[in-house]
From Swiss-Prot:
It comes from Campylobacter jejuni subsp. jejuni serotype O:6 (strain 81116 / NCTC 11828). Pathway: Purine metabolism; AMP biosynthesis via de novo pathway; AMP from IMP: step 1/2. This is Adenylosuccinate synthetase. Its EC number is 6.3.4.4. NCBIfam families: PRK01117.1 (NF002223), purA (TIGR00184). It catalyses: IMP + L-aspartate + GTP = N(6)-(1,2-dicarboxyethyl)-AMP + GDP + phosphate + 2 H(+).
Length: 416
């Protein structure tokens, strides 16, 4: 019996998980998404071609991989169908859990309207309706992908939901669709998606029993976890390794190696605490060189220096076996590079994450920069200062680096 390896982001998302999964996919039979929705975005470059994935597992770019969208994901049929249109021959290579919850048009309308009502206190959601979808799930009023197999019954259930919440929709100035319009959409979803809907948990159990190689692909980052992130400026699902298991119906004994994906610096989209944010020239330089624009939202990411306190925290949360250090090349040409080794908090120096992270100040150490690592594939060819930087990050995080990315391209990766 084999075990499922897990890839998790250990900052605030956008760490480069897509490239790592894409690089590793050739060694796996199954690649699985466990949580989130189309608020997540993976960017993968192959032979100069850019692929932006939101719901599809990154294994879709490898013909031999079977791709699974698990029960913990909230699925927008509209977005998924559009994404599927980019690829050929998906039958037999893509499966969607019948237990995954649906993310429909009214969810995004609710999301956008509620953010507007919050004004300056807005969380900074993607507006994709992910929170409202998970809220329906927790309230036990949601609908699941398996219900698409009976579109007429699902339409009737949704219309009853809309009628029961009519006052709420009117308050938010959201127009309720007609039954005819809704049924037409559901029938279209049914026609296209039915061949892909199945019990993916049983499929994965069978795969592990048969010693197939399985990779679980996390979405977003551990600092956005609903329980352990910078609440309330978090996502609506579990983004840590334990959540990857529950989002696919696997138990803790079925976890294999856990790899944490981390940028050589730090970024964040949306509002919330970000201790190492640099609002000056260095932050702007990182943003421009790193092309730090959100894949799902098109929003500019906030940029700053590597936060070793946060990474040490998320490394423990996830039980990491190794790190994959991404976008090291973005720091090419910086004369000095900062690392946050601790925080100042209420007059004390601390090395942990308090629940009120917005009240800390970073304590930095500086290291000398380097000229160029771009495109290097051999560790021995890295500049000495880059090697020293990597070694210091390992020391502060308490986890060894196994992979180093030196460009957006799939093959520009050092494996240690």
């Amino acid at each position: 019996m084999s075990k499922a390896d897990i890839i998790v982001g250990i900052q605030w998302g956008d760490e480069g998980k897509g490239k790592v999964v894409d690089k590793l996919c050739e060694n796996y039979d199954f690649v699985c998404r466990s949580a989130g929705g189309h608020n997540a975005g993976h960017t993968i470059w192959v032979n100069g071609v850019r692929y932006a994935l939101h719901l599809m597992p990154s294994g879709v770019l490898h013909p031999r991989c079977i791709n699974i969208i698990g029960n913990g994901v909230v699925v927008s049929p509209e977005v998924l169908i559009a994404e599927m249109a980019q690829f050929e021959n998906l039958k037999g290579r893509l499966y969607i859990s019948d237990r995954a919850h649906l993310n429909l048009k009214h969810h995004s309308l609710i999301d956008i309207a509620k953010e507007k009502l919050k004004g300056k206190n807005a969380i900074g959601t993607t507006g994709k309706g992910i929170g409202p979808s998970y809220a329906d799930k927790i309230n036990r009023t949601g609908h699941r992908v398996g219900e698409l197999l009976e579109p007429q019954r699902l339409c009737e259930a949704l219309m009853k939901d809309f009628e029961a919440n009519k006052t709420f929709f009117e308050m938010l100035e959201i127009e309720i669709p007609s039954a005819e319009e809704l049924l037409a959409d559901l029938k279209r979803f049914n026609e296209i998606l039915t061949p892909y809907i199945t019990d993916t948990t049983r499929m994965l159990w069978k795969a592990l029993d048969e010693d197939k190689r399985v990779l679980l692909e996390g979405a977003q980052g551990s600092m956005l976890d609903i329980d352990h992130g910078t609440y309330p400026y978090v996502t609506s699902s579990s983004t840590i390794s334990a959540g990857a298991l529950t989002g696919l119906g696997l138990n803790p004994k079925e976890a294999g190696n856990i790899i944490g994906i981390v940028k050589a610096y730090a970024t964040r989209v949306g509002n919330g605490a970000f201790p190492t944010e640099d609002k000056g020239e260095d932050g702007e330089k990182i943003a421009q060189i790193g092309k730090e624009i959100g894949v799902s939202t098109g929003r500019k990411r906030r940029c700053g220096w590597f936060d070793a306190v946060a990474v040490r925290y998320t490394a423990r949360l996830n039980g990491l076996d190794a790190l994959s250090l991404m976008k090291l090349d973005v720091l090419d040409g910086f004369e000095k590079i900062k690392i946050c080794r601790a925080y100042e908090y209420k007059g004390m120096e601390i090395d942990y994450i308090p629940s009120d992270l917005e009240n800390v100040q970073p304590i930095y150490e500086e290291m000398d920069g380097w000229d160029k690592v771009f495109g290097i594939k051999d560790y021995d060819l890295l500049p000495e200062n880059a090697k020293k930087y990597i070694a210091r990050l390992e020391e502060l995080a308490g986890v060894k680096v196994k992979y180093i990315s030196t460009s957006p391209e799939r093959d520009d990766t050092i494996i240690l």
